[in-house]
Every structure is written in structure tokens, then in C-alpha cells.
């Protein structure tokens, strides 16, 4: 909070305040970074090039004005998160000690007034704890500490497009350079922004394997990541999401089941958006 915020430095309790102002005190006071980016994106809106072909920022008006920041596609939401994190990362003030280890992207109660939908839209994970691409982007940049301790690379989005599609490919990486390969053929090295983002413009889609290889300053490979074109939908895959202690049949526990449409090789089909019908039998309530 802004009003009287400097007086908060002398209190013993955890309080709400700006991280850039208080990180020098966070060695002794727990802090949660929550509002460094309030942009939102609905999971099913991957990008403008694949189903359902949602135009970036298109959505209902808010008080007669465009609500672009609340109707992002997944690729642009991840890019925005990278840019916002970089603003903090390049400064990273503080004591020099390990005092900042995590952040929280909360769901705002005003979301349903600005975005096309409500809770499914907010956050880098949704209300069901399913990760969005922005989550994996954060994982690359901020895996436990603000300075890189584990080199990682991640390709934003999927690799399933109509024939003749030409689009940019974005890669988030801790390396100094990133080279992109399509079915083993090099497409060159990406343009670097915000330290972690590498963009490859005008990539022509061909089914197969899209792979990003990251290099350090010495030109040595330090990490790689690949995505593959999924085949035709073949089956449903159900995965239980539970705590380390497992489920408790005590009448109070909740069961979360993630449902995926997969091809014959078990690879997720990211663009299959058909309605799924469920039935439930046994001692449980839907």
C-alpha cells in the first residue's frame, strides 16, 4: 500500500506492500509478490494462428473501453509476464541474501467485469492448478531464486497448425543464445529481448519436431526443449491431482481429476476443444 507505507518498516507483522520498496526488509518479513502483472488470458486462446483463432485482446468492453489486457492469448500473456519480470530482475535490489523465493498470481474479484470469463482466466495457473505457458516461462526465469541456478529452456505454445501457416516462435531461456531446429534443420538463432525471450520470425509450419537449443557465452549447449505435432485424437487420459498424503475418504476431501485428449502415442492434443461428458459412480458427490 502507498499511504503510510514507509511506517510499515518498523512493524513486526507481515503486511501488504510494494516489493521494490520492501525487499531490503524481506529477510525478516515474509513477502508475496502478487500484483506485478494483472494481465489475464483464457486457456483455450493459444494464439491467432490456431483454433479458436482468437484475435489478441479481443473481448467485451469495460466501461466502454477496450479491455485488451484482460483478454490476452496464451502466447502474449507469457511474453507480457516475461517483460514484467525482467523489469524487476534487472534491478533486483536488496541485501544480497536469499530473501525472495516465490510469487503468487492471485485471482481478482473484478475479473468477470473485464474479461470474457472469470476464474478460468486469471493467473499463471488456473483455479484447478493447471499450468499455463506463463507458468513455465516463470519456471525458467525464476526457479527458486532471482539469479539463474538451473539452466532451462521452454518453447511457448504448441506445434499444431493448419497447412501454410507462417508465424513467430517465442522461446524463453536462461542461455545467451538460442537456436531453433525444425525436423533437425536449423532455422538460425533468435532475436533476444528482456534477457530471457528469444523470437524467431516467420517460421513456416511443417508437422514434426520443433526444438530449441540454448547456449552459454562460450557457445556450449546448456539446455534444450522440444515440442511435437500431435496426431489425431485417440483417447482420454485421466490424471488424479492429490497432495503427497493421497486421498482421504473422510467425506471432506476433494478429488481433482485432470482430463486430457491424447493421440495414439499418449501425446496431448492441444486444439481438441470438444465437450466431454462425465458419469460418477460410488460413494462420492459431483
Regions found by a protein language model. Name each.
Residues 1-141, 145-162, 193, 199:
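Substrate-binding/catalytic cleft of secreted carbohydrate-active enzymes
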Residues 159-165, 244-255:
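Short, solvent-exposed loop/linker segments at the N-terminal edge
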Residues 167-186, 209-214, 273-279:
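Beta-strand-rich binding/interaction modules
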Residues 171-172, 214, 252-269:
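Beta-strand-rich structural segments
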Residues 187-194:
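Short beta-strand segments within Ig-like beta-sandwich modules, predominantly Fibronectin type-III
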Residues 191, 235-238, 278-286:
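Short aromatic-acidic-glycine turn motif
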Residues 202-207:
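Surface-exposed, short loops/turns at beta-strand junctions within beta-sandwich domains
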Residues 218-231:
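Edge beta-strands of extracellular beta-sandwich domains
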Amino acid at each position: 500500500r502507498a499511504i503510510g507505507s514507509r511506517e510499515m518498516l518498523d512493524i513486526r507483522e507481515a503486511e501488504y506492500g510494494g516489493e521494490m520498496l520492501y525487499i531490503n526488509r524481506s529477510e525478516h518479513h515474509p513477502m508475496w509478490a502478487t500484483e506485478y502483472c494483472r494481465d489475464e488470458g483464457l486457456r483455450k486462446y493459444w494464439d491467432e494462428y490456431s483454433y479458436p483463432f482468437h484475435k489478441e485482446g479481443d473481448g467485451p468492453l469495460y466501461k466502454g473501453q477496450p479491455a485488451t489486457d484482460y483478454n490476452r492469448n496464451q502466447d502474449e500473456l507469457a511474453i507480457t509476464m516475461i517483460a514484467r519480470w525482467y523489469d524487476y530482475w534487472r534491478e533486483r535490489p536488496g541485501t544480497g541474501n536469499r530473501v525472495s523465493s516465490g510469487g503468487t498470481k492471485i485471482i481478482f474479484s473484478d475479473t468477470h467485469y473485464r474479461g470474457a470469463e472469470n476464474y478460468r482466466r486469471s493467473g499463471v495457473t488456473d483455479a484447478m492448478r493447471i499450468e499455463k505457458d506463463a507458468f513455465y516461462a516463470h519456471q525458467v526465469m525464476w526457479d527458486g531464486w532471482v539469479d539463474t541456478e538451473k539452466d532451462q529452456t521452454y518453447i511457448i505454445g504448441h506445434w499444431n497448425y493448419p497447412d501454410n501457416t507462417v508465424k513467430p516462435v517465442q522461446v524463453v531461456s536462461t542461455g545467451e543464445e538460442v537456436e531453433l531446429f525444425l525436423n533437425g534443420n536449423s532455422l538460425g538463432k533468435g532475436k533476444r529481448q528482456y534477457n530471457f525471450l528469444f523470437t524467431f520470425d516467420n517460421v513456416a509450419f511443417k508437422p514434426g519436431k520443433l526444438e530449441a537449443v540454448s547456449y552459454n557465452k562460450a557457445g556450449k549447449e546448456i539446455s534444450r526443449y522440444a515440442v511435437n505435432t500431435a496426431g489425431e485424437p485417440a483417447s482420454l487420459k485421466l490424471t488424479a491431482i492429490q497432495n503427497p498424503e493421497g486421498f482421504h475418504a473422510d467425506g471432506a476431501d476433494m478429488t481433482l481429476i485432470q482430463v486430457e485428449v491424447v493421440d495414439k502415442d499418449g501425446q496431448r492434443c492441444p486444439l481438441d476443444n470438444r465437450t466431454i461428458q462425465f458419469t460418477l459412480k460410488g460413494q462420492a458427490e459431483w
